[in-house]
Amino acid sequence: MAYSIANNQLLRKNFAKIKKIIDIPNLIDIQKNSYKRFLQIDTPPEARKNSGLEAVFKSVFPIKDFSDTASLEYVTYTLGAPKYDVEECHQRGMTFAAPMKVKVRLVVWDVNKDTGVRSIRDIKEQEVYFGEIPLMTENGTFIINGTERVIVSQLHRSPGVFYDHDKGKTHSSGKVLYSARVIPYRGSWLDFEFDHKDILFVRIDRRRKMPATVLLKALGYSAEALLNYFYKSEEILVAAEGMWKKADPELLASQKASVDIVAPKTGEVLLKANRKFTKAAIRKMTEHGITQIPITMEEVLGKYASNDIVDPSTGEVIVECNDEITQARLDDIKAKGITEFKVLFIDNLHVTSSLRDTLIADKIAATEEALIEIYRRLRPGDPPTLKSAQALFENLFFNAERYDLSAVGRLKLNFKLGLNVPLDCQTLTKDDVLEVVRYLIDLKNGKGTIDDIDHLGNRRVRAVGELLENQYRIGLVRMERAIKERMSLQEVENLMPHDLINSKPVSAVVKEFFGSSQLSQFMDQTNPLSEVTHKRRLSALGPGGLTRERAGFEVRDVHPTHYGRVCPIETPEGPNIGLIASLSTYARINEHGFVETPYRIVQDGKVTSDVKFFSALEEEGHAIAQANAEMDADGRFVNEYVSARKSGEFLLVHRDELELMDVAPMQLVSVAASLIPFLENDDANRALMGSNMQRQAVPLLKADSPLVGTGMERVVAKDSGVSVVARHTGIVESVDASRIVVKIDEDEFDETGTGVDIYNLIKFARSNQNTCINQRPVVKVGDHVKRGDVIADGPSTDMGELALGQNVVVAFMPWGGYNFEDSILVSEKLVKDDRYTSIHIEEFECVARDTKLGKEEITSDIPNLGEEALKDLDESGIIRIGAEVKPGDILVGKITPKGETQLSPEEKLLRAIFGEKAGDVRDTSLRVPPGVEGTVIGAKIFSRKGADKDSRTEMIERMEEDKLRKDEQDEIRIIRNSAVGKLKKLLVGKSAAVKVEDKSGRTVIAKGAAITEEALDAIPLDRWDEISVSGEAGVDEKVSAILQTLQQQIDIIRYVFDDKVQKLKRGDDLPPGVIKMVKVYIAIKRKLQVGDKMAGRHGNKGVVSRILPEEDMPYMEDGRPVEIVLNPLGVPSRMNVGQILETHLGWAAKGIGWKIEEMLESYSPADHIKGYLKDVYGTTEMDTFLDSLDKDELMNVAKRLQRGVAMASPVFEGASEEQIRSMLDKAGFDETAQVSLYDGKSGEPFKHKVTVGVMYVLKLHHLVDDKIHARSIGPYSLVTQQPLGGKAQFGGQRLGEMEVWAMEAYGAAYALQEFLTVKSDDVAGRTRMYEAIVKGKHTLEPGLPESFNVLIKELQSLCLDVELLEGDED
């Protein structure tokens, strides 16, 4: 075949200017890898890493009892095979999960009471069933109770330390107050903050604040130790002739000289008094050997002692540490003959006295008091003891069970504070606390930077695995409490591990997480793109995240670090804007949960082919060139200065300073945005709408891939998992609508494999959004397929490419007001050709229960119904497949026993004569709800185990079994044929060592004769092992090995299929009280109609306002009518010019197709067609491909291109205006793409030329059929007796205050009275009205509206005694 699927991608002309560097990573890897890391299902237990589930078990176990005489230890866990496969879970409404068993060891100790020595008494090991754990399907989803769900990844604040300030808002003076916060992964938060007096406070868990030194003292530091940690000291020398200080170059740099500094030998003045110590002056002093500097007494006064100053003779403390040096104290020091002492270096410029002031404000001296003070703050009301205070403090930050920074938190702490603590130390250390405080003080003193919490280095992603890991930990901790209690209540030595463990709490937590967590969502299955996008979504909401109300503008905003990591375009409109984002195309998530994006490495101005992934923190400070920077053939930058990004700024950087380069222009946008051609020409707001609306496109009956795409269509279709991809290379053996059989190439499969792939296609299944999932084969028998090729298209895919809409010819012009305000005028031809027809499948369920009054029964024998109503039901009471149904029709007949009523004597007599029948049951059949009209396409019946099966169930089972048997026979046939082929290769032509006879005793192969194919065919395969070959070693062994393998493979296949058949015939697990459940599926064909919403890919949306006959549409000179007319005013103010460029390029693509069609119709020579195609494509790759085709193949390609030549205009490197003009020229059109149009009604030409082209238009999920609704008589509200509202409740139309005014203005008094009484809540009036109509009288007698009674009761409840007095008018 000339255009196999593989070659089809060549047929899309690509305008990309940049060669592809790396492939886009698999789009749903974010889900799959995370869950794989969590379960480690393919890793042998002993090789498992300490992460995911393994880490959870290791962190909770061992569990010891209170007396420490027994411990329950964890060994390993294993996962079994799931009970049902994915398909069965869908059908039966089950959860796709694997049973988990955990091997635990119970160790019992003997403790010697005198010595306290422990010895092991007993060890018991056992595997304990630990509930089920949901498994992820191939496509990254979970099946919970039969529905597909997705766990959305959460973007939350990373653990670590964060510095911030209040921007001067807290205190009236406008002073900036700095604060630090240590956030662990789990555990207590620690906050440090300054107040307006520069005193440092600490809060634990946002409780009341206390001086920070209380915490530091509780850590065991004395006041002296703290002062010497946070401040440098100056040494003061005292003598009779004056005072000096030691010259410390580090401290001098910020000081002034108080007296002239003179060189001792030369007498030269090195620095005059009151001059700053410059670097040069300090250098000179060092050269002249000056180690001490003369100072005045004033300089020393007001300084603070850095340690106790002691009288050397008596040991008496003259000045205590942290005391101020006053004149009296200085005189005392001199008098006692002390020659040197140290003072704190505080200059109030670079070093402030805040920590010293805090120590003064803090009235607590010793560690013990500090611990008790902290205990009082955290547990007010509890009497503190030193032991309990110590235990509490220890548990707060230093106990790994209570406090966990996680590897990420430790990494961030080390990174910010420059520490070297190993990553596996995941609690706080004393040094951490000191360094956090030191950095905060430095920050206040003007060193260091505050953190930006919206930087992606400070936000990380928690994907499925991690979210589930946290839930599992919660469950295990709950279980741990129960186990400890059991261990202390019972004699442990008599127990086995399974007596202690009850896994219910764990299963319950997991079930709750998947069932009702905010991050576990019903998968958006409208089309393949919406599936992929849903799995790649990042949400800042959810448990442990933000809430909509609290999130400000900064969090929602686009941040420079989002580049290449999070899409700046795709986010919902409305209250969630910015809180829910999408991963960019090339982004991935590293093991720490940070989002990474790939860059090419640049060395010495030359771009290498190395690609490396960088997180937002690693990228800081690097200069990064754009992907479209000009380069020569060697990969050097052409321009000397290149536009680049560096630390969030856009700069011009010299080419030698560049370190990295983007890998692709579309690196910064998400999958949905990368599907919009000419995105660069659209306004961002409209691009946002465009990327969101593509997710709402309904799969159409006839998928049609876009003529103007971006080249991403194939990637999305393949990674979404809706199309069927070949698992191995091989040859297609057989194809029908529901399955494809591929015989695998011999070099592909191992000896154990069966050598056959059977792909069962999904036919007309219902998606979560009620759209239709259907797969169609795109290969023929005999085709050779490669591993990874698409062999069957799914919904919204066309030849392996995503196809969400249709290519239609559009004209931009007003037409009779029908395209006012974004309305769309559509040609009837689109409806007639089923271009926008979609199929929707509704599921209806009928349950027969065991009630108190007796069993409900599903049957066709329903009382008081005529033949007509039952004509489509079979004898089991279930509607036949293929029946056309409309609202009110019976789908499943069901009768329910009625409560016994008092019977009259006559009835009793009749019952006695005719037996109990019609009287005691009522009809509760499942009927078609209003607004549904379609064809029944399937029915499934689930019945209790052990219940009798009805004829319909048996028929369904037979059909399913036949299908399975056919698969089994095909597999056996193919592997048998393949084995026979191998054997014949070995045997034919060789000479036989023994003679072989057939059943009748006739010799088929004589001894010594050459073995022929005919002879082999005459012997049944199971007797081929009797054949022996002479003269060649090893052949007999090979033959018997092949036959043995064949037999084993056949046995395996039979075993697997028998198991499937057994499952079919087994009863179903139904909820308690349910006897039988029937599900009926109805397919509804929805044609395009007025009121349906349609949209382009550029945010240009509208509603169909009129469907015009084809002959009335504006037409071109050659008589071709346009298919859609859009309003030209929809473009300028919205600034989405991309739609015009798309229209122009689409017009060229269509025109080229028409030219090829003309050539084919006029039988142009093949070379002429080939030349034209080469001219259009203009790539050497395509030239080679076209040259490799023979004439027939070339004609096939040309036929495929008649509908138009598909183009790819990738995002940010799309077709230029020149290229579009040249394409229009090749199509033989005017460069402006404007055409003279004629009015379809009058035949007159329109005054001006009109822009006409081909646009890709989608039909969205907002269909008028789902919204339109009318009520006759329906349910009423209980209290007010007014009709309910809304389609779901079969409600009425609200008539509000303004509508009443309108009726009053018209003077329509009686109509209004009717609206407000009998048509609404006048209960008696409603009945009278009904009676009047039945009797044929047409009089209106309105009574009291029920809402009046409600009002009176309301007033009475306010103790106002209001009553209605009734009387005659006179």
Swiss-Prot record:
One Pfam family this sequence matches: RNA_pol_Rpb2_1
Enzyme class: transferase
PROSITE patterns: RNA_POL_BETA (PS01166)
Keyword terms, alphabetized: DNA-directed RNA polymerase, Nucleotidyltransferase, Transcription, Transferase
Entry GO terms, CC: DNA-directed RNA polymerase complex
UniProt keyword Secreted present: no
Superkingdom of this protein's organism: Bacteria
Coiled coil ranges: none
GO biological process: DNA-templated transcription
GO molecular function: DNA binding; DNA-directed RNA polymerase activity; ribonucleoside binding
Catalytic function, reaction form: RNA(n) + a ribonucleoside 5'-triphosphate = RNA(n+1) + diphosphate
Annotated EC: 2.7.7.6
Family label: Belongs to the RNA polymerase beta chain family.
Assembly and interaction partners: The RNAP catalytic core consists of 2 alpha, 1 beta, 1 beta' and 1 omega subunit. When a sigma factor is associated with the core the holoenzyme is formed, which can initiate transcription.
Task performed by this protein: DNA-dependent RNA polymerase catalyzes the transcription of DNA into RNA using the four ribonucleoside triphosphates as substrates.
Full protein name: DNA-directed RNA polymerase subunit beta
Organism: Geobacter sulfurreducens (strain ATCC 51573 / DSM 12127 / PCA)
